[in-house]
Amino acid sequence: MALPMVLYDHYGSLQQGELTGRIVILTHGLCMNHLSWSNSRYGGIGERLLAQRDNNTMLYLNYNTGRRISANGRSFANVLEDLVQRNPRITSIDLIGHSMGGLVSRSALFYGKQNLYQWVHMVENLVCIGSPHHGAALERFGFILQDKLGAFPFISLIGQLINIRSNGIL
């Protein structure tokens, strides 16, 4: 079952109503969701940012981490363009992404620029927290292991099993 890409407000409701001024969009990492930003186990960064906001609107992106980063980035770019079109009084955008969320945000900027989207010029900050911009070690290990096991016909089945992994980390 595919999860739709959705923006939530800080209170966990679907984003509705008019937005003005600066908006801050937090994008979660692999195998997480929009609620992770407020979880005290992860430092409660969403709560702390909310307490320090000066008339900023905090939004939380929820997306399917099983999709490829490029597909999520393209969808996120479209979501942002729709958001700005529906809310012409937005003045600036900050994107904060954790791990895979930083990669998805960066990908959204790429596709936003490619499509000449209006929102790209509103982005003032892109903050990536622990994002593997040079690739994830786990994924590199998976490719190496798959390659080595594939060389032995009698254990190539194990190599095929290793190849079954989320598109989000390919």
What is the role of each PLM region?
Residues Y42-E47, F76-L83, S105-Q114:
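Short, well-ordered amphipathic alpha-helices
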Residues M1-L49, R53-L61, L138-F141, D147:
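Flexible, membrane-associating and regulatory peripheral segments of lipid-active enzymes
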Residues I96-G97, G101-S105, G130:
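Gly/Ala-rich beta-loop-alpha elbow adjacent to hydrolase catalytic centers
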Residues F110-L170:
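Helical cap/lid subdomain of alpha/beta-hydrolase-fold lipid enzymes
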Residues L30-M32, T65-G66, G102, F110, ...:
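Short, solvent-exposed loop/turn segments at secondary-structure junctions
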Residues G21-I23, S92-D94, N125:
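Structural motif
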Residues N87-H98:
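Alpha/beta-hydrolase fold nucleophile elbow
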Residues R67-N87:
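Alpha/beta-hydrolase active-site loop
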